[in-house]
Amino acid sequence: MAQITMNIQTLDWTMGETVGLHLMVKKDCKVRIAWGDGKVQVVTGKQEPASEKLAWVEAGHAYPEKGVNYTITIYSEEEDAIIGFNGCGMFEVKTLDVILTECPNLRILGYSGYGEEKLDVSKNPLLEFIDFHEVRNEKLDFSANPLLEELHIDGSEDLVSLNLSKNDKLRRLGIFMCHNLQHLALSNQSQLNEVDFALTHLRPKDLEYLEKTLKRNSSYKVRGGSFGDEKIKEISHGMNPTRKK
């Protein structure tokens, strides 16, 4: 069985009772979303037209009351059914937490929310892509995610320490506006060649190693400050100017 759980609170403002999300589901597998108010929605995995590539399927809900806590449960009887989860329409409600520990085959994770959510992906070893903004963790360690290629945790103001020492495959990193982040550990074999750390004040030692890593990987792109300076700079070295950002 695969399961993702979210605890939310609807809010007393315009659209404060609405939520939406996208799922990438294995072809023909069914996934149920129990919205927590007695309503259940079922989605089925499908491919994009004229392609073998899996398509995102949409799900959404409007709650009957504002200012009420609800538990959303996304689940399938098949352990490998849920491949991607993007909570892209959760910004109108307050997120209390997002629980991913029972979805071991998750490869793609996105979340745009507001609230108190902390990120725990220690039980998701197949993750390749994470875009999870404004997490409330003080420390994050992605040692359990060796396949991770792209990570964005922009706006995570509570974050102090980020451990990527086991993430050899990581190529893109977004830590924009992580104001308190100072400690960044990278793998000695890191393939990192694109980073955005504007308005993030890494300590000089870690910033120096970051720059060495980027230069070692030849073609690289960086946007950020220099040694804690808020001045934003953009550097492209050896990159094709037509490359899609």
Task: For the regions a language model picked out, list residue spans one by one.
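N-terminal capping/linker segments that flank leucine-rich repeat
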Residues: 1-115, 123-125, 146, 188-190, ...
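A short local loop/turn or secondary-structure capping micro-motif enriched for an aromatic residue
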Residues: 49-52, 129, 170, 192-194
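Conserved hydrophobic beta-strand positions in leucine-rich repeat
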Residues: 83-85, 107-111, 128-132, 149-153, ...
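Canonical position 11/12 of the leucine-rich repeat
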Residues: 91-96, 115-117, 136-138, 147, ...
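Canonical leucine-rich repeat
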Residues: 96-98, 109, 119-121, 130, ...
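Leucine-rich repeat
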Residues: 103, 124-126, 135, 145-147, ...
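Functionally constrained cores in energy, signaling, and assembly domains
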Residues: 111, 115-116, 126, 130, ...
